[in-house]
Amino acid sequence: MKDFRVVFSLILLTVFILGCTQPAQPTQPQPEEKIKVGVLIPETGLYSSAGVAMKNAAELAAEHAGNVELVFADCGDSPEKAKTAFEYLVSQKVDAVVGAYSSPQAMVVADAAGENKVVYLVSVASTGVIEKKVTEGNRYVFRTAYNTTYWGVLAAEFLSLSKPDKYYFVGYDPLKTFNQGMLAKINELYGEPELEVYYKSPSVSPDDYKNVAKQIAERAGERDAIILGDPGGVSINFLKEYRANGGKGIIYSVGGALALPATLKKLNAGYTAFQAAALEETEKTDLTAKYFADYKAKFGEDANNYAGLLTYDSIMILSQAFEKGGKEKLIETLESGSFKGAAGIYRFNENHQALWGSEELKGTIGEFVNGKVEVVYPPEFATSQVVWPE
């Protein structure tokens, strides 16, 4: 019996030693968890030119972030299409949504976001209704874009810097609500225009922008400014028609199509000023230069489109919020945190509006003159004063 116990003990010891010396099985690397972000882009309809920039910027953001999976949906140019696109994104089980273009679209999507309990970052639309929805209890909605008031603040800033004899306000009829809200703030901060006029979409009235351009060109003087409230491609045609009819002074654009240096060079559009969330010359964070350089390298064109840059920043914000607090605490993290984008450092107020106008997040005004873009605002990045035609 004693011998049996000795043999049994030796067997156990051998098994134990062999077990300890067996090579460990390699563990399979766990795939990195990602936040699934739905992106509403206007691939069709009135705003399709902005849709291209928005999609490009979203893809670049996912590449830079590394922890984002994208799902795209075409929101077209109507609230109905935007809602259908949002519902598709929800069916794809996204964790958050960014995008849509117009204010009517964003309002419908904001309601749907609250109903479906999906975080929604408004990256373009400016209506004050968005903030009102938050105060009424919809905590799922945040806005990274300017509100309508800040669009007016920037235009008034340009007028204060340029000191024109008079200014004219030319709006775009499909965006009349936005334009009128912006103008109300300009009136408050600077004063009323010599004339307020709107041109219709070419799909409704093909020659209307030509008629308005001629009307303003006949009235505006050498030291007058034209505030142009159309960010789309028709603004290019308006500018060409205005100058062809002898239009003088400076045109200040809300950006978009007339904020692209390549376009301005091609048009030889000297004395055209514009707003942008950021410019390549304004290194607000370490993402600014990276965004502009990588966008141009990847897509072969300039990245000054406002809707594109704000789409990029919105996705980068969601990436950082996910990294800080996870999917379950997106709202709490967005409400309390600060987030880095190409345009600056984002924080949100009690109405979930990004704090544009704060020290770390300011819009930018550039002027195309002598073949290049000069920064005229904010002062810490200014490379020139406003230049008038001689």
Pin down the residues of each PLM region.
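Segments of small-molecule ligand-sensing domains
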Residues: 298-305, 319-375
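Extracytoplasmic "Venus flytrap"
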Residues: 38-57, 73-79, 101-102, 172-177, ...
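An alpha-beta-alpha
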Residues: 43, 62, 138-204
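Hydrophobic alpha-helical segments within soluble ligand-binding/sensing domains
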Residues: 82, 143-168, 208-209, 235, ...
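Extracellular/periplasmic periplasmic-binding protein-like sensory domains
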Residues: 239-312, 379-389
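Beta-alpha junction/loop-to-helix N-cap segments that form part of ligand/metal-binding clefts
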Residues: 49-54, 64-132, 144, 201-207, ...
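Extracellular/periplasmic bilobed ligand-binding domains
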Residues: 113, 118, 179-277
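Secretory targeting signatures
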Residues: 1-30
